[in-house]
Amino acid sequence: MFSDIEIARQAKLRKISEIAAELGLNEDSITLYGQYKAKIDLNANPQLQAQPDGKLILVTAISPSPAGEGKTTTTVGLGDALQRMGKRAVICLREPSMGPVFGMKGGAAGGGYAQVVPMEDINLHFTGDFASIALAHNLLAAMIDNHIHHGNALQIDPRQVTWKRVIDMNDRALRQVVIGLGGKVNGQPREDGFDIVVASEVMAVFCLADSLKDLRTRLGRIVVGYTYSGQPVTAQDLKAHGAMTVLLKDAIKPNLVQTLEHTPALLHGGPFANIAHGCNSVIATRTALKLGDYVVTEAGFGADLGAEKFIDIKCRKAGLHPDACVIVATIRALKYHGGADVSALSREDMLALDRGIANLEKHVENVTTHYGMPAVIALNRFDHDTEAELALVMKRMGEMGIKVVVAEHWAKGGAGAESLAAHVLQLIEGRSEGVRYVYESSETLWEKVNQVARKIYGAMDVHAPRPVRAMIDRLQDAGYGHYPICIAKTQYSFSTDASRRGVPHEHILTVRAVRLCAGAEFVVIICDDIMTMPGLPEEPCAIRMDIDDDGQVVGLY
């Protein structure tokens, strides 16, 4: 079997202008970035806006094992399958962050014969959107310290500056730093730190804005810190939001690429789902819904994280209504959640599998009962999966009235996902009710945390230190109580302890910190030891990457 990068290099790509033309986009509606990448103008073909929206399909997953379950691969495979069946399909994905690319994950553009291409470009810089977002974020950071240095007319308290700097890399050494050392000429010394760019509020604003004007307004509302008297200071107070918008004027346009089977794919934005809201941009999703009859998108990590935020933040804000949900699972991950050791996941273990299916059952309950979406299970099959194991999963899901479809798109491309696509179409045809939210906007922030913790995570209680609870109450009293919440926690467990697999019982959600995102219009609830700046693993993927004598990238995936 060829590696992902070898498969991608063997592909015969079509010019992206041809893909755009088939979507109804003329040459004036796109900006080419070479032959195989383009950006779609925000005012592309005004007549498209009169088109009815297509059907929206969400792909999510169970709580991931360390190896991942193939959610992006399934999203691509399903889109290809729909296209093969004569449907006008468009795929919507997030852009990869280079932190995980060089860290633990490697490439993030699908896998096997279900990939988006050009794979190397997508994983390495792409069209420069993340660099633009980082520049806009760090411009604001520079203007904060510059304002303090030149007289501090706004009376910003350096001890209460909440706006960190960002880079698109995993670097634990930058989590806490001291800036302004070396004398008066270098500014006022204060504690600072770095987040990874996908955790930036600018990224969240970028992905939730519905126009360039809305982007500018949201950027202006970003709270960067507080004055000595406790009043919030915004990017607009610093007159930074206009220049920030200038840096993002091209990045805000959705990126158009293609799959190995030439299905159009829009990749735009990339917030993580464990430390941010985990969805691609509203602009890209809305554009895709006008261009295609069926739009396949994903939300990061498991259905407890990305899917919850997709529903409670993105869909609520943008007025989106998903028509069906695909929950991705693997036999090996279910055995992992049943207590099997990572080294033993390729061996049949009916006992571990039986226990681990509880994790899938909880995600099914969340999707169907709490989010109100009809669901199907896409079981990504591996060679070592046995018939007995497959039969057990199908039996347990059948008892819940949920169909399990064995998916083989990794090995067979769209042809391996046609059965999955056919069942998704059946779910859409039988759709009769709208999406449900986990909580109402009218509930208090603390009530919202409790709703998600108890309903979605199965927690028995929520705890927060007194200063954190006081900050939540302060935000409530300041008029931010109607905002949705964005819980930052580990992706590996329903609890805040990554080692507690399956469906932990009697666990408590512990809130460590809270962060206001007034531009994105949500409140981040940070739990336990989750980090907004990841670190590299002991053996990062960067170790195996290189350039050969022909200038070809090796070891990317």
UniProtKB/Swiss-Prot annotation:
Short name of one Pfam family: FTHFS
Residues annotated as binding ATP: S65, P66, A67, G68, E69, G70, K71, T72
Disulfide linkage: none
Keyword ATP-binding among UniProt keywords: yes
Gene Ontology terms for molecular function: ATP binding; formate-tetrahydrofolate ligase activity
InterPro entries for the chain: Formate_THF_ligase (IPR000559), Formate_THF_ligase_CS (IPR020628), P-loop_NTPase (IPR027417)
EC supergroup of this enzyme: ligase
Pathway entry: One-carbon metabolism; tetrahydrofolate interconversion
EC number(s) recorded for this UniProt protein: 6.3.4.3
Reaction it catalyzes: (6S)-5,6,7,8-tetrahydrofolate + formate + ATP = (6R)-10-formyltetrahydrofolate + ADP + phosphate
A biological-process GO annotation: tetrahydrofolate interconversion
Keywords from the UniProt entry: ATP-binding, Ligase, Nucleotide-binding, One-carbon metabolism
Family as reported in the entry's similarity comment: Belongs to the formate--tetrahydrofolate ligase family.
Name of the protein in its database record: Formate--tetrahydrofolate ligase
Species per Swiss-Prot/TrEMBL record: Methylobacillus flagellatus (strain ATCC 51484 / DSM 6875 / VKM B-1610 / KT)
